[in-house]
Amino acid sequence: MASKKKKIQVTIELKTREELNPYLAPTYPKVVIVDGYHPFWGRCDVAEIMLKRFQEEPANANKVDWLSIPYEQIADIVPKEKNEKGEVIEVGSKPKYFIFVKGEFFVSINGIDLPKLREEIYKSYAKFEETTN
């Protein structure tokens, strides 16, 4: 009988704002990246592989927590993005990541753009260090 491989999960799955609040405390010791997903579409499982590889890199060890929560639980604490016509862009099937540093919103990234995500994460590390010293 073949054994099933256990899936190693990188993302901490949350359902409510109350579960998220401790991660957004000004004293939280890591950068926090939130996948704010639309409940109909769900989390982006494809991104999990990239996140796992990213977190395994020594430079990133113990510096970041990846969270996943339905967008409506964070809609009031993240800025609304607008298109060229000034219309609010709703969260849909494309992943949307929000980075927080010491409880403050830092930046959002649309889609699975790993180079852009890495760039913004490294900027958030610098901001974290700047506010720690």
What are these regions (language model features)?
Residues E13-T16, G36-H38, D45-L51, Q55, ...:
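Thiol-based oxidoreductase modules, predominantly thioredoxin-like and allied folds used
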Residues K80-S93:
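A short glycine-leucine-enriched loop at secondary-structure breakpoints
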Residues V31-V32, P95:
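Alpha/beta-hydrolase fold active-site loops
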Residues E90-N133:
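Non-catalytic, surface beta->alpha helical segment in thiol-disulfide oxidoreductase systems
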Residues R43, I49, P95-F98:
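Proline-centered helix-kink/hinge sites
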Residues V31, W41-G42:
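Structural hallmark of WD40 beta-propellers
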Residues M1-V31, N62, K116-N133:
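N-terminal leader/targeting and pre-domain segments
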Residues I33-Y37, I99:
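Structural cue for short, hydrophobic secondary-structure segments
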